[in-house]
Amino acid sequence: LKFKNLQFHALGTDTWYANIGPNHPLYHASEVTMEKLLPHPFVRLPDDYFSNLSFYLEIDGVRLEQFKRVVYVNDSAAILSLLRSTDVVRLGPGLSAPDFAEYGIRTIPIRNCQVQINVGWIQRSREMLSTEAQAFVKMLEELYPKNEK
């Protein structure tokens, strides 16, 4: 980043959780394991140029490619609909928990999840933020208050 005259402003860290709807047998679990999730369909967006999660992501010794039933969708509304009406599982950050909870979807910790997501924003060095950009950064900072991890 320094070479490109960019600065990273850290907001916080997160990890991955299992998003599970009311038709999933593990809906009331306080914690899940990847082994217990494997028999269920996994819903996700397709990998893109910048994210190739299928080949490198591993949680507690289980790689995403080990899911035998994967449902690829092209938008978040389809994910939400499937989570609400079937036994699919989605993996994602805890930040989205309040949004999913509005629709009766639980965000459940995954045992031994070593995934760490560093959340932040990037700014050009020596460049002032516009009023709109400052407001957006403030909104982001409210999602990751300084007094948390």
Where are these regions (language model features)?
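Short secondary-structure boundary segments
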Residues: L1, P22, Y49, G92-S96, ...
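Residues embedded in well-ordered beta-strands
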Residues: Y17-N19, P25, V43, V89, ...
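Hydrophobic hinge/microswitch elements
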Residues: D47-T107
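Secondary-structure junction motif
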Residues: L26-S30, M34, L38-R63, G94, ...
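Alpha-helical segments flanking ligand/cofactor-binding loops in enzyme cores
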Residues: H9, E35, L80-S81
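A late-sequence structural motif
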Residues: H28, R106-K149
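Short beta-strand-centered segments that line the small-molecule binding cleft or hinge
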Residues: L1-W16, I20, E58, R106-I108
